Amino acid sequence: MATKTAGVGRWEVVKKGRRPGVGAGAGGRGGGRNRRALGEANGVWKYDLTPAIQTTSTLYERGFENIMKRQNKEQVPPPAVEPKKPGNKKQPKKVATPPNQNQKQGRFRSLEEALKALDVADLQKELDKSQSVFSGNPSIWLKDLASYLNYKLQAPLSEPTLSQHTHDYPYSLVSRELRGIIRGLLAKAAGSLELFFDHCLFTMLQELDKTPGESLHGYRICIQAILQDKPKIATANLGKFLELLRSHQSRPAKCLTIMWALGQAGFANLTEGLKVWLGIMLPVLGIKSLSPFAITYLDRLLLMHPNLTKGFGMIGPKDFFPLLDFAYMPNNSLTPSLQEQLCQLYPRLKVLAFGAKPDSTLHTYFPSFLSRATPSCPPEMKKELLSSLTECLTVDPLSASVWRQLYPKHLSQSSLLLEHLLSSWEQIPKKVQKSLQETIQSLKLTNQELLRKGSSNNQDVVTCDMACKGLLQQVQGPRLPWTRLLLLLLVFAVGFLCHDLRSHSSFQASLTGRLLRSSGFLPASQQACAKLYSYSLQGYSWLGETLPLWGSHLLTVVRPSLQLAWAHTNATVSFLSAHCASHLAWFGDSLTSLSQRLQIQLPDSVNQLLRYLRELPLLFHQNVLLPLWHLLLEALAWAQEHCHEACRGEVTWDCMKTQLSEAVHWTWLCLQDITVAFLDWALALISQQ
């Protein structure tokens, strides 16, 4: 409202609720003051027309709680109305009045009771409402889900890592129906899961600042549901979470909450779990409040994934050797119990570090192993280092060349390694011994050069030189060729016996016969031979009497059955030979599908073995079974034809005796030919030596 003043002749701005003293000087100072006041008032409207919008609010926060407040409006006293300030037209910000105790969700005695009391139908109804109102903003749907669950699941607070429960707690308590709702909503909002994971984690950290804060079971359930299907969300930006962890290093509860949330990715995937452990937990290993959870998590992770092939390639030398120092170096920042626990995990970490092809990677670990193997290192660590160095030299051929390059600058460490090789030389494979011989000779030449130059580490050079000489003696030492010696002894005995019998023209007059007679062995052997001969004659006469009768009777009784069995056998063999190829093809296809399933879980060597096994039945059928079967059929046909021709259709003892005599004679001739050929070969071998 404005009025025209007669004395001044100018317009004056009239404001309601004018401060004292403002209107007193208005007429004397002219219109400039009025224009400045108008400009100030307009300026307020120009730059702050509405209060700031809370971007993190969700439908649940702005809708569900307001509905509850309106329903309980008669129980809440109305807020006091503040008088408007006359000089400011800015709208006052609404101060959210905290709900009283009657409005808050009551705490249950346990999380199980809270989940049983949760109305799944009401949750689905609220989520449907959220999706209909915010149809194009799936992040709000997810935030509504987390807020609803966390609001309804108010149970007693637990420690941040939930170490007293299973790895999938609290998600393991969720019913199948509720899991379906959660996973269905996560599938609809797949593009917002990474932001939702960050929202849950940061909201949990904010709740930890409140005293007392709400229990965080709803957010934990959402995090576990996300990472169970998409564990890579936690490892997509580990650097960000490491900075977050370091910024809260003075708050162990927040750090453990971050580690717990990221660690849920490992229970679904070993690779992602190792990424989390190496990127988040290894950097804080040694901090008193965080180390127990880090080692416990690693133990649980490796226990849940016994097949370590999925984790090959994740641990490199930069990550492995700090773990070695933590496990074996005394007086470090770990407690003795944690260090002992890490020592028990070390063999599996070593398998992960060496990977699927240690024969091509161990030489990269050799320098760090060698530099740590000092004479002053602890005994347990020295034992592990020397064992690992020996494994490097045994498995990876390139480790020997790396050792030759490092040798002049690591004489004390090399002396320990050489002495260890000397003491365990018999356990090293023969092929590796031959390859190490060249390396040891090279080291011996290096020792001689260092001794001529007068090296400062003269004592270490002398120790290394003595160990090299001992190893070379082990390599080049004389060993009896036992196989050749036994063969030579056998040939000499046979040759002496033949010469003795030939020179004395009889066994009784030979030196061998006299020695056997004087020792008493010859009479005993003659008596045994006589008894054996008499028993053989009795058996021969009994067979001559009974075999023709029993043979004729048996042939009369069994011939129809044999003919029928022979016909069935031929039919069966024909059927199998006709259908065997299809079955083998089916078996090969089955092995192919099985190998494809196991290809991800098994190393390359096992896959190659499976491929060979898949081809083995077909090769065995084609190259062994079929030729043997045809050979057997031909042999049976030839034997049947030969017996029919020899015996003229009648089975008599004389005919069988003749055939057996011919077979024995033919066998004896073959053995004589084989023996003569063996003696000729042995004599030729001896003459070449």
Curated annotation (Swiss-Prot):
Membrane-spanning parts: 480-500, 616-636
Primary residence: endoplasmic reticulum
InterPro entries registered for this protein in UniProt: TMEM214
Manganese listed as a keyword: no
UniProt-listed GO biological process terms: apoptotic process
GO CC term, one of those recorded: cytoplasmic microtubule
Pfam families in the cross-refs: TMEM214
Bias-annotated ranges (Gly residues): 20-31
Subcellular location as annotated: Endoplasmic reticulum membrane
Span list, region Disordered: 1-37, 70-107
Topology with respect to the bilayer: Multi-pass membrane protein
Residues bearing attached sugar chains per UniProt: 269, 307
Top-level lineage group: Eukaryota
Assigned keywords, A-Z: Acetylation, Apoptosis, Endoplasmic reticulum, Glycoprotein, Membrane, Transmembrane, Transmembrane helix
Residues carrying N-acetylalanine: 2
Keyword set includes Ubl conjugation: no
Protein function: Critical mediator, in cooperation with CASP4, of endoplasmic reticulum-stress induced apoptosis. Required or the activation of CASP4 following endoplasmic reticulum stress.
Quaternary structure and interacting proteins, as annotated: Constitutively interacts with CASP4; required for the localization of procaspase 4 to the ER.
Protein family membership: Belongs to the TMEM214 family.
The protein, known as: Transmembrane protein 214
Annotated organism of origin: Homo sapiens
Gene label: TMEM214
